[in-house]
Amino acid sequence: MTTHKHRRTEKNLCFKQYYKWILCFILTLYFFASFFVDHDQDHRSSTSISKHLLTNHKPKLFASRAMFESKIHDHKLGFTSQQPNIKTDVFNNLKIYVYDLPSKFNKDWLANDRCTNHLFAAEVALHKAFLSLEGDVRTEDPYEADFFFVPVYVSCNFSTINGFPAIGHARSLINDAIKLVSTQYPFWNRTSGSDHVFTATHDFGSCFHTMEDRAIADGVPIFLRNSIILQTFGVTFNHPCQEVENVVIPPYISPESLHKTQKNIPVTKERDIWVFFRGKMELHPKNISGRFYSKRVRTNIWRSYGGDRRFYLQRQRFAGYQSEIARSVFCLCPLGWAPWSPRLVESVALGCVPVIIADGIRLPFPSTVRWPDISLTVAERDVGKLGDILEHVAATNLSVIQRNLEDPSVRRALMFNVPSREGDATWQVLEALSKKLNRSVRRSNSFL
């Protein structure tokens, strides 16, 4: 009996050992199979990428877990990726080709540092941002492009008399660039330039004149009338200087200067200026040319509120004026020679409620920046009532407007970053261009 039990116990032990051996073998086989499958997939993926890089010279982005984890890590540390990952499906598979023009059209002008920092510098920032685009938006193959960007800087010819940009050379410089691309490439001639994009970051856009009457008389040059113009000028009524396909863009304000201003402002600092304006305010608005600066609006502001302690009005220049904007509740943005003003961007970026005094102005990127929610509009004829209007707003919905101004996406949409970042001004330009793809030869040919 004992012997029989002993044999049965030995048999059970052998069975258990045999079962464990089988289980270990199966698990080992599974892990080895998984390893070789993964290794083979990685090898094939690596081979595929290598073939792609050898056969296709256009830059592409390949996501990896390491890249993803590094981006999360960078975000936690407060850093952002140095290159934007912009995929074409965000903009209806939009593709842009940037002409590589001789340096006399763009880079040579950068010898003057002001060229990259003044209020007209969006022409430079956009060029740099387009060149920085990673992913699939910028193409190095012009035959697969929807649009062609022609980078000509015309705002960097600063006057030795008053320091302001002189743009009398703009028409001839752009015309020379068009002659160049139309003779060396086939793309301009096939559409008469309708799929070509230019910048005109001046008072009256592609009319290229600082005085409105002269701008209207000259109009948009014939050689640009079929193209797309990215311009700071825009009005809601018919105007000769926007009788061309156009996208209204914000004036350029250096992101670095704004970051520096924000960094130097104490978090607990209260806004101790109620209404702020610093800039040109003529006591006698009719200048030597016989024209009235700002349609007398700034003169009327000075005459009505120059002695009002609620209004901090300054006529002299001050390098640290952004810190004054950051201390203010309301920031006046009256027209100058043209309706638009860099104060719009600075006010939004620094959390001061913009008070827009420019009848009929068309503002940039209205689908993203809900201007009625973050600003006030006062008619030019109502400047004399400005104090009462602002008192009423302060007593009713000021806190709502200020809360809307805190939305970071609003501020981001008005900034030109290099490289471009998701949601910024360059991103908004790409979004606007993606809605004009009916001009693309590549798209029309795909339906033939």
UniProtKB/Swiss-Prot annotation:
One of its GO terms (biological process) is glucuronoxylan biosynthetic process. It is a single-pass type II membrane protein. One of its GO terms (cellular component) is Golgi membrane. Keywords: Cell wall biogenesis/degradation, Glycoprotein, Glycosyltransferase, Golgi apparatus, Membrane, Signal-anchor, Transferase, Transmembrane, Transmembrane helix. The keyword Transferase applies. Residues 38-448 are lumenal. Belongs to the glycosyltransferase 47 family. This is Probable glucuronoxylan glucuronosyltransferase IRX7. The gene is IRX7.
